[in-house]
Amino acid sequence: MDVNPTLLFLKVPAQNAISTTFPYTGDPPYSHGTGTGYTMDTVNRTHQYSERGKWTTNTETGAPQLNPIDGPLPEDNEPTGYAQTDCVLEAMAFLEKSHPGIFENSCLETMEVVQQTRVDKLTQGRQTFDWTLNRNQPAATALANTIEVFRLNGLTANESGRLIDFLKDVMESMDKEEMEIVTHFQRKRRVRDNMTKKMVTQRTIGRKKQKLHKRSYIIRALTLNTMTKDAERGKLKRRAIATPGMQIRGFVYFVETLARSICEKLEQSGLPVGGNEKKAKLANVVRKMMTNSQDTELSFTITGDNTKWNENQNPRMFLAMITYITRNQPEWFRNVLSIAPIMFSNKMARLGKGYMFESKNMKLRTQIPAEMLSGIDLRYFNDSTRKKIEKIRPLLIDGAASLSPGMMMGMFNMLSTVLGVSILNLGQKEYTKTAYWWDGLQSSDDFALIVNAPNHEGIQAGVDRFYRTCKLLGINMSKKKSYINRTGTFEFTSFFYRYGFVANFSMELPSFGVSGINESADMSIGVTVIKNNMINNDLGPATAQMALQLFIKDYRYTYRCHRGDTQIQTRRSFEIKKLWDQTRSKAGLLVSDGGPNLYNIRNLHIPEVCLKWELMDKDYQGRLCNPLNPFVSHKEVESVNNAVVMPSHGPAKTMEYDAVATTHSWVPKRNRSILNTSQRGILEDEQMYQKCCNLFEKFFPSSSYRRPVGISSMVEAMVSRARIDARIDFESGRIKKEDFAEIMKICSTIEDLRRQK
């Protein structure tokens, strides 16, 4: 049957059709090859925007650095990074005037966090540049390697596990004349395989010690590794993102904690909230502007876009902001917070893997590592690459480019939001002192600006003033990409507003479908996604019912678990049919065991096992949920698990789903081949961390989790906890005297062992 697609939209208001224009179905584009070219683009662009700044040379590393702060005022609309210090400080002062005590209170909150945060905070996060191996590693491993090397060099402040002590080590490490590090190297040798008698190449990974001179160490500590951002939709060109090393991470964390605390108190900030909370904040600002624009005033909204936000921001400006925000605070606190921007003013961008060359007849492939780009003959490269390399050469040191201006993506989202909000704050009538005034929203580099004025000229004047104010703070509103509408229709962080928010359903499309964790989790996540979209995204009952049927179909094809009475033949159908035939109550079988689907849109909140429990045969119940069954996952499954779902923009978000432990909640085993590589030690470390953390959680269930006070090791904390719990259990009669004695004996043994060690 042919359907004329326009018919679908006859009943739909135009704004609701927005979701059909989004590039969110199908696989997103991924990058291949190296990010070297993209990184060079970033470095060169950043310097171009600030080209009229002052050049200096870093005394420690010898890197040339460009400082655009207080540079020339713009004469045209081209993007520039010349922020004016006095303007930024004044904007901060006005922000504080409008919100009395905001900086003071945020500083106090942050101070508390600084004193309490443990160093394991740095194990969160994905890939981190590991300066000891000069490549990316999982965060926990990179931290472990850093601490190991610090110990090797006599730095032990981090033993107590406070992040602030680890940061003291970082500062001390910068003063050392040389640092000894442990790094890996590969040995290849040909050996005869016993089984097949063929020759094979065996790779062994050795660890060797190496000394780094002060200059080399400081360069590594200031290095951000770069990669290509993957899975970005709606873009033709890829772009580079950065991952900092462990020396920078902790300092950034504290700065962002302070900035987050400030953002939480600002009604114009789109961070750190999200989802419905963000929509409510937004709606409030719009309501305020609409209500105040009585019949006498016009109100217009700009859906704003800034040109190259990161590349025009400047760490020196952030330093000025922090200096102002913390001006009445203790010296140590001000120092800790000012280190991150100082390190970023001296950062180096690693150029990644370098370039791959292939000879015409495809026989030879060779890689030119980034380290060689400073000296190689340029005739091998095409024109555009040659230009890039020529431009970047003066900035290169050991395969990294000196990049003083600019911020790299996603490093100081909160702090840059504070800067943006400070301009929105200046739009109040008492500050503009004219007929026009403005307000709006800021979320990192995205903004919406609402301008009110008696007439069109006033609106234009207000927009111009906003634009110029932004320029003074190093923010470049793009006149080409921003557009203006009557207030009531605009877009902000992919939320579309038209007299209220329009559900942009296409954004959620990537999270529908089978996640591929295991049969139990996938069923649960699938129905939870549908449920959540009915609540939050205008997914109507008919569409939800259809989504559910499609999901069940998808699920059955993924796990080859078609109904027991189906004609479809798969590898599992023989077993499933056998089970179907010997089951009395067929409705009780889980979908993954060939049972029927009992879900409809009314019962999506109930886990499948619970939904069907009463319908199950007794022996099926026993097999499915028997903890003695070796196939029932022995991990203690919390009643709520977290899945990672991919919304179309922003980071992957976690979503809670109900988890019931059955034979279907298996955890796949790791691929064995990792055990023969350099990663093996890392894997063992990871497992050890995991075991220690699990054990610790057993002693301190989240409900009673108090941070161990004072400087006690994990073991000491657990032993003292065990003693307290045992005493309470003994006195209340929950355990016998013998058990109590046994526990006390074990605790003493552990302490003796620690003393001997």
Curated annotation (Swiss-Prot):
UniProt-listed Gene3D superfamilies: 6.10.140.720
Entry GO CC: host cell cytoplasm; host cell nucleus
Family statement drawn from the similarity comment of this UniProt entry: Belongs to the influenza viruses polymerase PB1 family.
InterPro entries registered for this protein in UniProt: RNA-dir_pol_NSvirus, RNA_pol_PB1_influenza
Location in the cell: Host nucleus; Host cytoplasm
Biased composition (Polar residues): 55-64
Originating organism: Influenza A virus (strain A/Swine/Wisconsin/1/1967 H1N1)
Domain RdRp catalytic, chain residue ranges per copy: 286-483
Region (Disordered): 52-78
GO molecular function: nucleotide binding; RNA binding; RNA-directed RNA polymerase activity
Catalysed conversion reaction: RNA(n) + a ribonucleoside 5'-triphosphate = RNA(n+1) + diphosphate
Subunit comment: Influenza RNA polymerase is composed of three subunits: PB1, PB2 and PA. Interacts (via N-terminus) with PA (via C-terminus). Interacts (via C-terminus) with PB2 (via N-terminus); this interaction is essential for transcription initiation. Interacts (via C-terminus) with human PKP2 (via N-terminus); the interaction competitively inhibits the interaction between the RNA polymerase subunits PB1 and PB2.
Main location: host cell
GO BP annotation list: DNA-templated transcription; symbiont-mediated suppression of host gene expression; symbiont-mediated suppression of host mRNA transcription via inhibition of RNA polymerase II activity; viral RNA genome replication; viral transcription
Protein name in UniProt: RNA-directed RNA polymerase catalytic subunit
